[in-house]
């Protein structure tokens, strides 16, 4: 490369670094008593530290020990962030929604996926989120989800016939992702053609791989690939929405898309295409990443722990024996899966499918003796409580009994958030996990082929080799 170009690039890097250093110092000087911590490298923040840490859990705990067990500052995804820790931090964030804090999503997620609305501002994301919550809470109530259980069971059976039964060895993670996304396409959009599902799922891989990265849009970066994938998802999903609106009178399905099209607010206003798109996207992201990760690690622990598998098998076989030939699962069957759900919760405690969630400070406030300025982003982390021996004795031990009775103390087990921002898809995820567990456990025993498989962390934890197992049919 030409020496002049190299010199120019070096000079530009130094200039940009100094700009961000002085800009950060000036901004920080306006507030006293900020949370302790580090902003890391200019532009990159502590993203490199996070990436080279063996896990997000280690990253969080090292800084809790070094700075504060209640709140510390860092810089991730191009933002100054206050990480709230422990039960007090969780309670504070969950209790101050729309008082001190409001919804915020990283640009690396919103730009590739969110559809611009008429107002086209960060506020539009917040408005959509509020609409999303109210609408989704209604349609995702347990009484409204009952109708989905037979469909989930039927699709799980078909999935096993095609992807599991013909083989002696399978990779769990990619198969579960395929199942959960196909199920979402069927229930949300009434799409069951494999080729049509693939037109959505392939670009989704690009989007989810770049969702929580530094938003640098240069060729070859994860963020750049996410934007390209997002454009393909947007084009395909918008085409589906417009076609459904045209043919809605002849459509007799009661899927999510139909409900979104017919939904109106208290003023009689219907959603526009962008709002419909954004609501669907939220559920597709959750079903593709977090739920599939949860199911994967439930099966991982069932493969590793024969005693746990046997107890789940007993419970599920009691249900199976009560069913007629070909009879599908129903709501009453799900309610009997108490031990199975305790097992799922313990797997989620040890290997949370989502790390936490972001908020934005809408005013200056204090917590733990520190000031969090307006405009800063906040984050609550599952890793600050899920393995705390104060709340979970012998935290590395797999013990489903922790969830018997009233279960863990409030604000200690938080994979679905809490307060007004409790994940509205929690019940949907519970049904999906339990239905899949039932179909696996009543059909197969699992043997891991890579005993100490490495776990890598993206938006969710991922087994490096896809969790390959040998499957043994149960007679």
From Swiss-Prot:
* Cofactor list: heme
Question: Transmembrane helix among the record's keywords?
Answer: yes
Catalyzed reactions:
beta-amyrin + reduced [NADPH--hemoprotein reductase] + O2 = daturadiol + oxidized [NADPH--hemoprotein reductase] + H2O + H(+)
Work out whether the entry's keyword set contains NADP: no
> Where's it found, cell-wise?
Membrane
Where does the UniProt entry say this protein principally localizes? Answer: membrane
What EC number(s) does this enzyme carry? 1.14.14.64
State the membrane topology.
Single-pass membrane protein
Question: Which GO molecular-function terms appear in the entry?
Answer: heme binding; iron ion binding; monooxygenase activity; oxidoreductase activity, acting on paired donors, with incorporation or reduction of molecular oxygen, reduced flavin or flavoprotein as one donor, and incorporation of one atom of oxygen
Q: Write out the GO cellular component annotations.
A: membrane
Keywords, comma-separated and alphabetical: Heme, Iron, Membrane, Metal-binding, Monooxygenase, Oxidoreductase, Transmembrane, Transmembrane helix
Q: Which GO terms describe its biological process?
A: pentacyclic triterpenoid metabolic process
Write out the tissue specificity statement of the associated record: Specifically expressed in roots.
| Residue positions binding heme | 423
- Family assignment? Belongs to the cytochrome P450 family.
Looking up PANTHER family in the UniProt record yields: BETA-AMYRIN 6-BETA-MONOOXYGENASE, CYTOCHROME P450 26
Name of the protein in question? Beta-amyrin 6-beta-monooxygenase
Give the organism, scientific name: Solanum lycopersicum (Tomato)
């Amino acid at each position: 490369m030409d020496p002049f170009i190299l010199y120019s690039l070096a000079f530009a890097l130094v200039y940009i670094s100094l700009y961000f250093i002085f800009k950060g110092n000036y901004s920080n000087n306006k507030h006293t008593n900020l949370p302790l911590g580090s902003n890391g490298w200019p532009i990159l923040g502590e993203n490199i530290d996070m990436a080279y840490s063996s896990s997000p859990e280690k990253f969080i705990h090292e800084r809790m020990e070094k700075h504060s067990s209640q709140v510390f500052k860092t810089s991730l995804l191009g933002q100054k962030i206050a990480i709230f820790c422990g039960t007090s931090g969780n309670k504070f964030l969950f209790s101050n929604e729309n008082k001190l804090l409001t919804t915020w999503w990283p640009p690396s997620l919103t730009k590739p996926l969110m559809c611009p609305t008429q107002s086209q501002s960060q506020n539009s994301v917040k408005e959509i989120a509020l609409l999303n919550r109210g609408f989704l809470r209604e349609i995702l109530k347990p009484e409204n989800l009952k109708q989905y259980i037979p469909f989930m069971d039927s699709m799980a059976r078909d999935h096993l016939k095609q992807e599991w039964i013909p083989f002696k060895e399978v990779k769990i993670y990619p198969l579960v992702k395929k199942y959960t996304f196909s199920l979402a396409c069927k229930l949300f959009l009434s799409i069951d053609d494999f080729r049509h599902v693939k037109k959505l799922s392939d670009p989704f891989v690009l989007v989810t791989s770049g969702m929580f990265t530094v938003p640098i849009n240069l060729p070859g970066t994860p963020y750049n690939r996410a934007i390209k994938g997002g454009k393909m998802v947007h084009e395909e999903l918008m085409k589906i929405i417009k076609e459904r609106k045209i043919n809605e009178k002849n459509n007799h399905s009661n899927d999510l898309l139909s409900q979104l099209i017919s939904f109106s607010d208290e003023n009689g206003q219907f959603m526009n295409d962008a709002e419909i798109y954004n609501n669907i996207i939220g559920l597709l992201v959750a079903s593709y990443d977090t739920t599939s990760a949860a199911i994967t690690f439930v099966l991982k622990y069932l493969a590793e722990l024969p005693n746990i598998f046997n107890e789940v098998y007993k419970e599920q076989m009691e249900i199976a024996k009560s069913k007629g030939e070909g009879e599908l699962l129903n709501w009453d069957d799900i309610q009997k899966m108490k031990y199975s759900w305790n097992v799922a919760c313990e797997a989620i405690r040890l290997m949370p499918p989502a790390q936490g969630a972001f908020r934005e400070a809408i005013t200056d406030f204090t917590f733990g003796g520190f000031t969090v300025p307006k405009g800063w982003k906040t984050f609550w982390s599952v890793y600050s409580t899920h393995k705390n021996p104060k709340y979970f004795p012998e935290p590395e031990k797999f013990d489903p009994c922790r969830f018997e009775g009233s279960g863990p103390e409030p604000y200690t087990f938080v994979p679905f958030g809490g307060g007004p921002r409790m994940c509205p898809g929690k019940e949907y995820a519970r049904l999906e996990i339990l239905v899949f567990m039932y179909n696996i456990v009543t059909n197969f025993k699992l043997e891991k082929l890579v005993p100490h498989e490495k776990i890598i962390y993206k938006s969710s934890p991922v087994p490096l080799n896809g969790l390959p197992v040998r499957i043994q049919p149960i007679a």
